[in-house]
Amino acid sequence: MKLLGGLLLLFTATCLCNVDCDIYKKYPVVAIPCPIENIPVCGSDYITYGNKCKLCTEILRSNGKIQFLHEGHC
């Protein structure tokens, strides 16, 4: 039972540590239409982005050098 709980926790943590930016790849980086919503996320450059779309813009602009760290402010 502990093994199952540990695997579930690992799976959940893995899923939360990724942002799917594939939907934004069809736009030029300078023209990605991000919604006006304030749901902050922290990037691996330790900058707080206003939402996942704005982080994806930077991820694509940096060719993947910046990554998602966690939800909320850095």
Swiss-Prot record:
One of its GO terms (molecular function) is serine-type endopeptidase inhibitor activity. Keywords: Disulfide bond, Protease inhibitor, Secreted, Serine protease inhibitor, Signal. Residues 1-17 form the signal peptide. Its main location: secreted. GO terms for cellular component: extracellular space. SUPFAM superfamilies: Kazal-type serine protease inhibitors. InterPro entries: Kazal-type_SerProtInhib, Kazal_dom, Kazal_dom_sf. GO terms for biological process: inflammatory response; negative regulation of cytokine production involved in inflammatory response. Pfam families: Kazal_1. The record marks I36, E37 as: Reactive bond. Disulfide bonds join C21-C56, C34-C53, C42-C74. This is Serine protease inhibitor Kazal-type 7.
